[in-house]
C-alpha cells in the first residue's frame, strides 16, 4: 500500500490534461489552507492574462489538514530512534502518483519550507514529472539539530 493524500482542488482547469497543473505543497505544521489566497490570486491573474485554464491543487501532507496518517509500513518503516528514513521519498512517490492518476505527466511544483524539501525530492526521484520548481523559503539541506 502507498501513502494516500487528500487533494484540495482550487481549480480543475477543465480537466484538460494537455495543460500543466500547479501543485502547491505546504510547509510544516500547516495544511493546504495556507495556499488559499495564493491560489485565488494565481487563478485571477491567469484569467486576466487570458491564460488557458489549468489545474491548481494543494494536497495535504499525511497527518496535516485532511491528510490521512499512513502506517509505519506505508511510510517505509521506522528506525529504532523513531525516524522514518524513507518517509519523504514515499511522500514524493504519493504526490507523483496523484498527478499521474489525474492523467497528467508533469506539474509545476511550488513548495514552501518543508514543501520545498518534498518537491526537491520529487525532482530527484521523478524528474520526468517536473515541468518547473518554485522553492519558497526553503533550503536543499535538512534542518540541523540546533
Feature roles, as predicted:
Residues 25, 59-61, 136:
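Alpha/beta-hydrolase
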Residues 30-31, 64-67, 141:
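Active-site loop signature of alpha/beta-hydrolase-fold enzymes
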Residues 19-27:
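Short beta-strand element of the alpha/beta-hydrolase
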Residues 17-18, 48-54, 128-129:
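Short helix-terminating capping/connector loops at secondary-structure junctions
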Residues 27-30, 113:
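Active-site glycine-rich loops that stabilize anionic/oxyanionic intermediates
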Residues 2-12, 37-110:
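Active-site loop/oxyanion-hole signature of alpha/beta-hydrolase fold enzymes
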Residues 30-33, 37, 117:
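Short alpha-helical
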Residues 105-144:
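Conserved hydrolase catalytic core segment
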